[in-house]
Curated annotation (Swiss-Prot):
Organism: Streptomyces avermitilis (strain ATCC 31267 / DSM 46492 / JCM 5070 / NBRC 14893 / NCIMB 12804 / NRRL 8165 / MA-4680)
MF-aspect GO terms: aspartate 1-decarboxylase activity
Functional note: Catalyzes the pyruvoyl-dependent decarboxylation of aspartate to produce beta-alanine.
Name assigned to this protein: Aspartate 1-decarboxylase
Pfam families: Asp_decarbox (PF02261)
Annotated catalytic residues: 25 (schiff-base intermediate with substrate), 58 (proton donor)
Length: 139
């Protein structure tokens, strides 16, 4: 049996562009891809914190150091420049691998620069006003 497990996320990234006329996908700065262990073409889920929209698409590598998080194609109807999003990837792994899997959590600033790396999916952004859910167990 394979389990689908949380593999990585880029937490609270700011959407820098959205264009209906681009080929559908999400363009992400190569520095963020490396930090989150994401590959071009990889399936990701995007959760829009600003409006609650959720979608899935695939990754296109963006210019390294640019801070780009660009929503392309039809998804631009749902996600807009300035929105805060969480970009999440999953992995299908064996039960033994699932029990040992340490996800990558990438916290970014308003310019989509990495400010902290971690493995706890419930950890709030360092230095923010966010709080850990009181019911969440520390990873």
């Amino acid at each position: 049996m394979l389990r689908t497990m949380f593999k990585s996320k880029i937490h609270r990234a700011t959407v820098t562009q959205a264009d209906l006329h681009y080929v559908g996908s999400v363009t992400i700065d190569a520095d963020l891809l490396d930090a989150a262990d994401l590959l071009p073409g990889e399936l990701v889920h995007i959760v829009d914190i600003t409006n609650g929209a959720r979608l899935e698409t695939y990754v296109i590598e963006g210019e390294r150091g640019s801070g780009v998080v660009g929503i392309n194609g039809a998804a631009a109807h749902l996600v807009h420049p300035g929105d805060l999003v969480i970009i999440i990837s999953y992995a299908q792994v064996s039960d033994a691998e699932a029990r040992a899997l340490r996800p990558r959590v990438v916290h970014v600033d308003r310019d989509n620069r990495v400010v902290a790396l971690g493995a706890d999916p419930a950890e709030p952004v360092p230095g923010s006003d966010q709080a850990r859910s009181p019911q969440a167990v520390t990873a």
